[in-house]
């Protein structure tokens, strides 16, 4: 796996990014040690049944921020219909696991620097809405080759830099109807929000160790490319989860989270975000 490590990724509440390269996604995600430890503890609590009575539906207060360099779609000024289709895709993808995104407001900003992912903290300090349980998605024209990135949940003090930068940045051309084929069906937002909800990539850890700390996702040596049906990169553990939203298949190949991932999202939500 080729890893590009942004400076921001070295802090807790780490960056998780996906970038297209030669027709496939690559990863610049560097989950911090604290999040591995938190995932291991949450997995143990799930195994013990400690979260069994906490699997109620999750309603996520959601804000969309369109940040473009001009009022042209090619410069990132995506339409209301595209945004409506994006929230619909997210809700369809998460509905089987009791998660619903309630789009409260959409903001639109013309700022060429911000639209190219410049001055991230200044942008988010200006635009961010809600508490730590609120999902802020920033649709940007250019992410330096990336499709998107998100921050993992942590214990963030209100008003801190970790709190301000929380949320997801998504390439505007990846929304439904965008120009970013084969990543133009809205699955980038689904994938990135999975990190915001506390999920690793399915290929985390390769064929050994704890992997993604979710027991029902088969081990996977490396990210998928395209839609390689029948791929089995870790013999003995089952075929690779190429249809999982947390792999790197093309959008048309993605169609599921596992039951265990749904449980993990619920557990992480209640551990880090609920009521905050």
UniProtKB/Swiss-Prot annotation:
A single cellular component GO annotation: extracellular region
Record keyword Membrane present: no
SUPFAM superfamilies: Metalloproteases ('zincins'), catalytic domain
Annotated EC: 3.4.24.-
InterPro entries the UniProt entry points to: MetalloPept_cat_dom_sf, Peptidase_M43
Active-site residues annotated for this sequence: 192
GO molecular function, one term: metallopeptidase activity
Chain sites annotated for binding Zn(2+): 191, 195
Inducing factors: Peaks of expression occur during the endosporulation stage.
Keywords carried by this UniProt record: Disulfide bond, Hydrolase, Metal-binding, Metalloprotease, Protease, Secreted, Signal, Virulence, Zinc
UniProt key word Transferase: no
Gene3D superfamilies (UniProt xref): Collagenase (Catalytic Domain) (3.40.390.10)
Cellular localisation: Secreted
Signal peptide (residue range): 1-18
Disordered, as annotated region: 211-233
Disulfide bond sites: 227-253
One of the protein's GO biological processes: symbiont-mediated evasion of recognition by host pattern recognition receptor
Database matches in PANTHER family: METALLOPROTEASE MEP1 (AFU_ORTHOLOGUE AFUA_1G07730)-RELATED, PTHR47466
Family, as annotated: Belongs to the peptidase M43B family.
Function: Secreted metalloproteinase that allows assimilation of proteinaceous substrates. Pays a pivotal role as a pathogenicity determinant during infections and contributes to the ability of the pathogen to persist within the mammalian host. Digests an immunodominant cell surface antigen (SOWgp) and prevents host recognition of endospores during the phase of development when these fungal cells are most vulnerable to phagocytic cell defenses.
Protein name, as recorded: Extracellular metalloprotease 1
Source species: Coccidioides posadasii (strain C735)
Gene name for this UniProt entry: MEP1
């Amino acid at each position: 796996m080729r890893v590009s490590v942004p400076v921001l990724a070295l802090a807790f509440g780490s960056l998780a990014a996906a970038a297209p390269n030669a027709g496939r996604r690559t990863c610049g995600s560097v989950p911090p040690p604290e999040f591995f430890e938190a995932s291991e503890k949450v997995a143990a609590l799930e195994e013990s049944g400690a979260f069994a009575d906490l699997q109620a539906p999750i309603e996520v207060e959601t804000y969309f921020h369109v940040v473009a360099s001009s009022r042209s779609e090619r410069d990132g000024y995506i339409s209301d219909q595209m945004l409506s289709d994006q929230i619909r895709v997210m809700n369809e993808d998460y509905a089987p696991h009791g998660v619903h995104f309630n789009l409260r407001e959409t903001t639109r900003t013309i700022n060429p620097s911000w639209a190219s992912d410049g001055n991230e903290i200044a942008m988010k300090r200006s635009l961010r809405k809600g508490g730590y349980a609120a999902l802020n998605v920033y649709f940007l024209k250019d992410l330096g080759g990336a499709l998107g990135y998100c921050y993992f949940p942590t214990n963030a003090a209100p008003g801190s830099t970790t709190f301000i930068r929380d949320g997801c940045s998504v390439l505007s051309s990846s929304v439904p109807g965008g120009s970013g084929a084969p990543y133009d069906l809205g699955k980038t937002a689904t994938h990135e929000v999975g990190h915001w909800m506390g999920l690793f990539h399915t290929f985390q850890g390769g064929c050994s160790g704890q992997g993604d700390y979710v027991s029902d996702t088969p081990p996977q040596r490396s990210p998928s490319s395209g839609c390689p049906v029948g791929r089995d990169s870790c013999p003995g553990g089952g075929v690779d989860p190429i249809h999982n939203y947390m792999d790197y298949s093309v959008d048309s190949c993605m169609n599921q989270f596992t039951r265990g991932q749904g449980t993990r999202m619920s557990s992480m939500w209640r551990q880090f975000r609920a009521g905050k």
